Amino acid sequence: MKKKILIAAVLAFLAVLTLVSCSKDKPAESGDLGDSVMVQIEMQNGGIIKLELYPKAAPITVENFVNLVNEGFYDGLIFHRVIKDFMIQGGDPEGTGMGGSDTKIKGEFKQNGWDNPISHVRGVISMARSRSMDSASSQFFICHGDATYLDGQYAAFGKVTEGMDVVDEIASVPTDKNDRPVED
């Protein structure tokens, strides 16, 4: 019983995603990526993940993500898919990996005719999608480890600037055979 309560407390502490602020910021360090947009993910426990988004690399993706943030779409959602050393995934209002927003956007990556210079390395945020190249809507993932084999196949659009320790904590929660945290 104590173990179940502890696991539930840890997951409640880590897994609830609430995006609470979004604002323009100074240009990115890499002049190639243009002005950046800062987004902050605030966890239920107060943990913070700060993201720098790059509209020059993926303008449609960044605009969609920021619009969803501003609408409160992500408020209260969980990271529903967690694979240590690969990624943590959120943005599904159903919490199953099958849901999303009503809007589907163009996949901004090489296989879909878009020059996106961002590589899927530790800390990069990218859009999740189905097999269809233009199926991304609201689900996203943050790379927990390098996944450069995804380059050219998924729309990377920013990176974690602060809070990788929070990503590491989420990536360490117990999961079931479908990579879903065992407790919401």
Locations of regions flagged by a protein language model:
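Cyclophilin-like peptidyl-prolyl cis-trans isomerases
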Residues: 6-184
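Positively charged n-region of N-terminal signal peptides that target proteins for export
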Residues: 1-5
